[in-house]
Every structure is written in C-alpha cells, then in structure tokens.
C-alpha cells in the first residue's frame, strides 16, 4: 500500500485511549487523528482510514514483539501483519444518528442472549455490522451494553454529534477484515468532528 497519510498524526495522548483500555473485552480498533491539511471531505476520510489501518497494524506488530521479548528475550524484524489496498475502499456518507444508534433490548433469555427491536446483519450476505453491535456483541460475551456504549462515545465525541461528518466504508480493501468475513462481521467508519478538528476511525473484524 502506498501510504498517503504523512500529514496526519495519531493523538496518542488523548484521554480516550486511557478510557478504552478499561474495556478489555472490546474488540474494536479505534484511531484518533489530527491532520495538517484542511478538511476535504471524502478525500480526507479516505486518507484517515489508510492512516488508521497502518497504525493498527503497527500496534499489532508491537504487541507481538513485546510478547516475544517476554517469552524468549529476543525479537525478530516482522512485516506488518496484513496488506491494504486503499484504492479499493468505497465510502458512503451516513447520518451520525445511524452510527450512534442504541437499540432497545426487548428481553434477555436465560443464557444471556439479548433480543432487540431491530434485525441483526448477516455478514454472509455482505451486510456490515452496526457500531453498537461491534461494541457489545463480539464473538465472545463482553458484558457491555447501552450504558457503556454511551459512556465511551461521550468521551470519543465530547462536543456531541451535531457537527460530525461520518462515512461508512466497504471492508474488501484489507485482509485485516478476513476474520470477520468468515462469520461475525466487519465494520469500518471514519468520523470528522468539525468542533475539534479531529478524525476518529472505528474498525472491527473478528471470528470465534
């Protein structure tokens, strides 16, 4: 992948990262970004997801290298764990309310399965999962729900949702998404917050 995001930087000291570490069963990858370039709509969002994918790959590599140090005291140079072809990514603008929707839990059965006031996506038919579903319905039970989801997003979008530009992206442009295509699902969104001139990229992919 030819990397186009050198004008971008990850906001590694943002307090959101400290908060999300407390949710250790959350499988979403978040990336908070500032950009030296002026906002250019679709083009800026596409740069943001390319930048975020690289940062998430670097995190994954760092984690594996740290594990090697802990296990054997030495490391080997490793390539990034997946490939990306950003030219294949296609995005569509959506309403912030669609991204941040919180469904009603109608009931919970005796084994803990929840039933909602909306249908669930079928990844085998190419349907992408919703943000709430990615947050609190991962392949293995998280124990999270609407309260935790709202709390996380109140920190992620501290000025509210009125000035958010949101794009939902296809997930056929990186093998990061391969696991999720097997069963549970995939998702990728980019959000530009006009109030604080910040991008948030939200990605998820998992299987059992």
Model-derived regions, located:
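Extended, low-hydrophobicity segments enriched in charged/polar residues
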Residues: 2-158
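Acidic, proline/glycine-rich low-complexity IDRs
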Residues: 142-208
